[in-house]
């Protein structure tokens, strides 16, 4: 299997979990690539080099990746939207925190989950990928989200117009 690993390079609590994951995947013959900032974080904090590849963007993993592992919480998993976009790469959420709704594999169940994954005993939850377009350049990067967007008006007395489309079909316009 070809695995990509993503995590936020800020949480020392997940170092041993990530190290165990990499060891398990390597021992089972998986090809691994780690998101570059996270790989640097791991190397700096564990004082250890990892014999894995790295990646920086969607372009690096969009083809030839079987799964992307997200290590952290739900926020970390939501970050992966910008990495997988419309590639249909399944995201496996490993919860390194206290509570996870999207990242549902706990540290305690990691080995069981990895074994099931290797045997093909898993199911996929379909998620909705949304794209937001605006008349003004309001995005610094990607204009996509998983499941929902939150809109805030800059001026409370101004009106906004929202056009909603589903698969290119006008659903309803709201003023």
Language-model features and meaning:
Residues 26, 84-87:
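Short, conserved loop/helix-junction motifs that constitute active-site signature segments
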Residues 66, 70-74, 81-83:
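N-terminal glycine-rich "phosphate-gripper" loop used for MgATP/nucleotide binding
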Residues 1-67, 108-123, 134-143:
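ATP/NTP phosphate-donor binding region
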Residues 87-105:
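Short, acidic/small-residue loops that bind anionic groups at enzyme active sites
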Residues 14-15, 75-81, 173:
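Short glycine/serine/threonine-rich phosphate/pyrophosphate-binding segments
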Residues 35, 71, 92-94:
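Generic beta-sheet signal
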Residues 101-173:
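Catalytic core of DAGKc-family lipid kinases
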């Amino acid at each position: 299997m070809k695995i990509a690993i993503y995590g936020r390079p800020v949480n020392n609590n997940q170092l041993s979990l990530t190290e165990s994951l990499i060891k398990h995947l390597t021992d089972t013959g998986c090809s691994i690539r780690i998101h570059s900032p996270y790989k640097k974080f791991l190397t700096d904090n564990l004082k250890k080099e990892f014999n894995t590849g790295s990646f920086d963007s969607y372009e690096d993993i969009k083809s030839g990746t079987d799964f992307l592992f997200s290590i952290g919480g739900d926020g970390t998993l939501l970050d992966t939207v910008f990495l997988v976009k419309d590639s249909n790469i399944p995201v496996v959420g490993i919860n390194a925190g206290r509570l996870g709704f999207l990242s549902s594999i706990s540290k305690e169940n990691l080995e069981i989950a990895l074994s099931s994954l290797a045997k093909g005993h898993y199911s996929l939850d379909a998620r909705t990928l949304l794209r937001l377009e605006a008349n003004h350049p309001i995005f610094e990067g990607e204009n996509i989200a998983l499941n929902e967007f939150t809109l805030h008006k800059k001026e409370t007395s101004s009106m906004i117009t929202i056009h909603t489309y589903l698969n290119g079909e006008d659903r309803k316009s709201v003023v």
